A protein has these predicted regions:
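A short, well-structured edge-of-sheet supersecondary motif
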Residues: 18-54, 84, 290-293
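Active-site SXXK
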Residues: 20, 42, 59-85, 113, ...
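Active-site helix/loop module of the DD-peptidase/beta-lactamase fold
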Residues: 79-118, 139, 168-204, 209
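Active-site-proximal alpha-helical segments within enzyme catalytic domains
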Residues: 116, 156-163, 203-226, 281-298
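Active-site-proximal binding-pocket segments
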Residues: 182-242
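Active-site Gly/Thr loop motif
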Residues: 238-296
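Structured C-terminal helix/loop/strand segments within mature extracytoplasmic catalytic/sensor domains
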Residues: 277-347
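Peripheral terminal and inter-domain segments
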Residues: 330-480
Length: 480
C-alpha cells in the first residue's frame, strides 16, 4: 500500500512561497479549485483541499477515466488476450447491424482507438441517442477512414472499456483492482458510473475517486509500472502510451492539448504527460524534474481555465525548482501550512450588500410560459444569507445561498450536493452561483435583474448531463 511521506517543500527543492503564489494566482483568476497535490521524488510537498472537499472526498474525474481504460487494455495485451492491432468489430458481432458494419468501422483497430484516430469525428452516442452506447458506436455511420485524423471520441474509449469488461467478466474498476489498484491502497469506495442502459462502466468519463487515488496511479506509471521491485504494469506498453502517437494540433482548445496524444494520455509542454479530465481534473508527470501535479477543479464555463492552471504552475513553481534550499528557518513553511490547510471553495465575487434588498425582500413575481417552466419566484434575506423560492413543473423549491460565503445543501429535484453563493453585480441585479459538488460536477448561474415592477431571470447551467430545465431567459411581473 502506498503511503507517501509529507515533507517541507524546500526539502525537495520547491519553494513554499512559490506554492502559495501558485494557488493564490488561481484564486485571483477565479479558478474554482477543489484540491492541489504536488509531489517530487516520491514525496508530497503540498496537499490542499478546498472545503468542503477533504482527502477522502470522491471526485468525478471525467476523462481521467480514459487513462485507466488504457492501462486495462495494456494489461490485457500483456496477458496475450488481445493485440493492439486487432479489429474492434471482431469482438462485438452482436452489436453490429444485420447488414454488417461500415467498411471504415471494419478497418478500425484497438491501437487506432487508443490514439483517438477512429472513424468517428464526434461521439457516436451523442448522435445516435441510444442508451446502448456500445451499440451506437457500431451503428452510427462513420465519417472517415480510421488511422488518419485525430478526433476526440469518448464513445471509442467507452467501447474499449466494454471490451475489458466483456473479456474479463468483471467491471472495469474491479479488474484494475485485482491487477494493481488494491496493492496501491486505491479507495474501496471509488466507483465508475454506468452508461444509460446500466450495463457498462462509463469508461470515457465516469470514474469517481480521490485525488490521492489518482496520484498513486500516476506515481506507478512514472516508475515505469514498477512498485517495490514488482512490475505491476507492463513497461513496454507504458513507454508507448506516454509518448506522442497522434497529433491533436488544431483539434484541441488549449496550447497544452496541442502537444500530442499517446494511448489515452495527453502530452504537455516541458516534456510531460497527463491524465486529463474535463473541468481541471489533472495528474501530470514531468520526468525532467520528477514532479507530479494533481488537481481537481471545476473550470467548466471558465474560458481557458485549464490552461491557466498549467501556466500558473509553470510560472510560480516549475520554473523555480531547485532554486531554493531549506535553511532551517520555518517561518515560510509555517505560513505555507496555514495557507495549505485553510482553503475553501470560491464564492461568487461582487458586492454583498445593496439597497436592492429592501425593495425585493419577500416580494413575489409571477411568469407566463417560459423555457424553464418557472411560474413564480420570491427572494428573502436574513443577514448574510438568503433564500430563492421558486415553483416549476416539479413543485415548490427552495435554494439557500450565502452573501460572501457558500451555503451547502442538496440541490432541489436532483439531490446533488451543492454550494450556493450570491453577490450584487449591479444596483438592480443579484447573481446566484450554484456549484455542484457530487458525482455530477458543474455550476449554474441564476441572475435576477429588476426594473420597476418587472424581473428578468437568466438561468444558465454549465454541466454535461443534467439541469436542462435550468437554462433560459424570461421575465415576470410583481404579483398584485
Amino acid at each position: 500500500m502506498l503511503d507517501f511521506e509529507k515533507v517541507i517543500p524546500e526539502d525537495v527543492g520547491i519553494s513554499s512561497t512559490g506554492l502559495i503564489s501558485f494557488a493564490r494566482k488561481l484564486e485571483y483568476n477565479n479558478i474554482p479549485m477543489h484540491s492541489i497535490i504536488v509531489m517530487r521524488h516520491g514525496k508530497i510537498c503540498m496537499e490542499s483541499y478546498y472545503a468542503p472537499y477533504t482527502r477522502d472526498t470522491l471526485h468525478r474525474m471525467f476523462s481521467v477515466t480514459k487513462s485507466f481504460v488504457s492501462l486495462a487494455i495494456g494489461l490485457l495485451a500483456d496477458e496475450g488476450r488481445i493485440s493492439l492491432d486487432d479489429h474492434i468489430a471482431d469482438y462485438f458481432p452482436e452489436k453490429q447491424p444485420e447488414t454488417g458494419v461500415h467498411p471504415y468501422m471494419q478497418m478500425l483497430t484497438i491501437r487506432q482507438m487508443l490514439t483517438m484516430r477512429t472513424c468517428h469525428d464526434k461521439n457516436a452516442y451523442k448522435i445516435g441517442g441510444s442508451p446502448d452506447w456500445v451499440g451506437s458506436f457500431f451503428t452510427v455511420t462513420p465519417d472517415h477512414v480510421p488511422g488518419t485524423n485525430f478526433s476526440y471520441d469518448t464513445a471509442s474509449t467507452h467501447t474499449l472499456g466494454a471490451l475489458v469488461e466483456k473479456l474479463t467478466g468483471m467491471e472495469l474498476l474491479d479488474y484494475l483492482r485485482t491487477k494493481f489498484l488494491d496493492e496501491l491502497g486505491f479507495s474501496k469506495e471509488a466507483f465508475i458510473l454506468k452508461s444509460p442502459d446500466g450495463k457498462v462502466s462509463m469508461g470515457g468519463s465516469g470514474m469517481c475517486a480521490t485525488p490521492q487515488d489518482i496520484l498513486k496511479v500516476m506515481y506507478v506509471v512514472s516508475q515505469n509500472g514498477k512498485l517495490g521491485g514488482k512490475q505491476l504494469l507492463p513497461s513496454g506498453y507504458l513507454k508507448e502510451a506516454t509518448v506522442k502517437q497522434s497529433d491533436p494540433y488544431g483539434k484541441s482548445g488549449t496550447w497544452e492539448e496541442m502537444q500530442g496524444y499517446g494511448y489515452q494520455f495527453w502530452m504537455t509542454t516541458h516534456n510531460g504527460y497527463a491524465f486529463f479530465g474535463m473541468g481541471g481534473q489533472l495528474a501530470i508527470y514531468y520526468p525532467d524534474k520528477d514532479v507530479i501535479l494533481v488537481t481537481t477543479a471545476d473550470v467548466q464555463g471558465r474560458q481557458g481555465g485549464v490552461q491557466l492552471i498549467y501556466d500558473a504552475f509553470y510560472e510560480e513553481v516549475y520554473s523555480h525548482i531547485d532554486a531554493c534550499t531549506y535553511n532551517g528557518d520555518n517561518s515560510d513553511y509555517e505560513e505555507f501550512q496555514k495557507f495549505e490547510n485553510s482553503r475553501q471553495l470560491l464564492v461568487q465575487p461582487g458586492e454583498y450588500s445593496s439597497d436592492l434588498v429592501s425593495k425585493i425582500n419577500g416580494q413575489s413575481y409571477e411568469f407566463d410560459d417560459n423555457p424553464c417552466g418557472v411560474t413564480d419566484i420570491k427572494l428573502t434575506f436574513n443577514g448574510d444569507e438568503g433564500t430563492f423560492f421558486y415553483t416549476n413543473a416539479t413543485g415548490n423549491h427552495e435554494l439557500h445561498f450565502g452573501l460572501g460565503k457558500n451555503v451547502f445543501q442538496n440541490f432541489p429535484d436532483y439531490n446533488f450536493k451543492c454550494g450556493a453563493s450570491a453577490a450584487f453585480r449591479a444596483d438592480n441585479n443579484l447573481l446566484i452561483k450554484v456549484q455542484i459538488i457530487d458525482s455530477s460536477v458543474g455550476n449554474m448561474y441564476i441572475s435576477l435583474s429588476y426594473i420597476d415592477d418587472y424581473v428578468t431571470v437568466m438561468m444558465r447551467k454549465i454541466e454535461e448531463s443534467y439541469f436542462t430545465e435550468y437554462d433560459g431567459v424570461f421575465s415576470g411581473k410583481l404579483k398584485n
